[in-house]
Amino acid sequence: MNIKERMLLREKFYSPYATKDKESIRLIPLEEDIRPNFFRDIDRIIHSTSYTRYMDKTQVFSLKDNDNISKRMVHVQLVSKIARTIGRALSLNEDLIEAAALGHDLGHVPFGHEGERILNKISLKHNEGYFNHNVQSVRELMDIENDGEGINLSIQTLDAILCHNGELELKEYHPKKKTTEEFLQDYE
């Protein structure tokens, strides 16, 4: 039994709501290797230039030095840990959860949410629609990384990053299975 087969054994204990590795959808198929699909998404994100940029960014902005203000990298790692713990308790795919958590803030602009609010006002004023960091995160991963080629993450990982605050906007919160066609329509 190889590494991938051992890692995928845990899928037999997944909840019916969990996404299995074989359900992974990519715009460009990958050659098989020893890692499960969503684990590969984790690797692609942590080796991306966008993720490296987390290194020296603060999660919140302060005009004073403050040791209690964490770096965005620490925030993302804490979100990942908490999300995986919840995912484990609910018998979900922890690799998919980790990939989404690690990529969820890649599209943040300088000055965090306040910078996003300012850009949103400017964008709306010029009839360009809303400016949302989650949309920018997906754009970064699909259209900017790798000299504009993107890093070919699974549609499920991209969808989780895109919708990471969807319950706030839609005022609902429940799992919804999607077909391949529904996933791809979201990205046209």
Where are the model-predicted features located?
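Short alpha-helix carrying the canonical HExxH Zn2+-binding catalytic motif
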Residues: 98-103, 107
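Short secondary-structure transition/capping motifs
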Residues: 34, 68-76, 107-108, 126-130
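Active-site flanking loop/helix segments enriched in acidic
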Residues: 26-33, 37-47, 51-74, 175-185
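Sequence-structural signature of the catalytic-core scaffold of metal-dependent phosphohydrolases
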Residues: 2-30, 48-52, 81, 89, ...
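Alpha-helical phosphate/pyrophosphate-handling elements in metalloenzyme active cores
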Residues: 64-96
